[in-house]
Amino acid sequence: MKWFLFLLTTAVLAAVVSAHEEDGVCNSNAPCYHCDANGENCSCNCELFDCEAKKPDGSYAHPCRRCDANNICKCSCTAIPCNEDHPCHHCHEEDDGDTHCHCSCEHSHDHHDDDTHGECTKKAPCWRCEYNADLKHDVCGCECSKLPCNDEHPCYRKEGGVVSCDCKTITCNEDHPCYHSYEEDGVTKSDCDCEHSPGPSE
């Protein structure tokens, strides 16, 4: 009977751990592998997963494997190669001397001609980098001619069932990025209401 209870308990625990691990893998790239009760907010937690775990080929199983003082996993470029498949794929050195990954155009100085850095995905919310001479580093930009518009892009707008990212082709409203109110002769107007906006031919 004791053996039966032992085996039953072991099986239940194994099932719980297995289910927990399955729930924790938020996506195939595993940018974070612990989900909350609603399955929405993710975090990397070394208590739940072994940051040092390796695959049979010797590579690390998780994109972030270094644990901080709070036992939370951090993404370290010294541990794994950074690339656009990882949620953070630009590396720079922190004050602690370690090299960390970041998804930021600010850390892609050598790649300002490479639009693949900052690709627009859930892993990388900024998908296009442009070198800003005044700031002397790359900044993120949104150009819908580069990628299809969708509701994750800041320049996405839908007007009359038509999707557009161009102020010249859709009716402006206060939800539009180029909508700008100004006052003229005591009257509040918009500079993006067809009357003041450049037309398609301009």
Curated annotation (Swiss-Prot):
It is found in: Secreted. Glycans are attached at residue 41. GO terms for cellular component: extracellular region. Keywords: Disulfide bond, Glycoprotein, Secreted, Signal. GO terms for biological process: multicellular organism adhesion. Disulfide bonds join 51-64, 120-126, 149-167, 172-178. Residues 1-19 form the signal peptide. Component of the insoluble proteinaceous cement which allows underwater adhesion to rocks and other surfaces. Shows specific adsorption on calcite substrates. This is Cement protein 20. It comes from Megabalanus rosa.
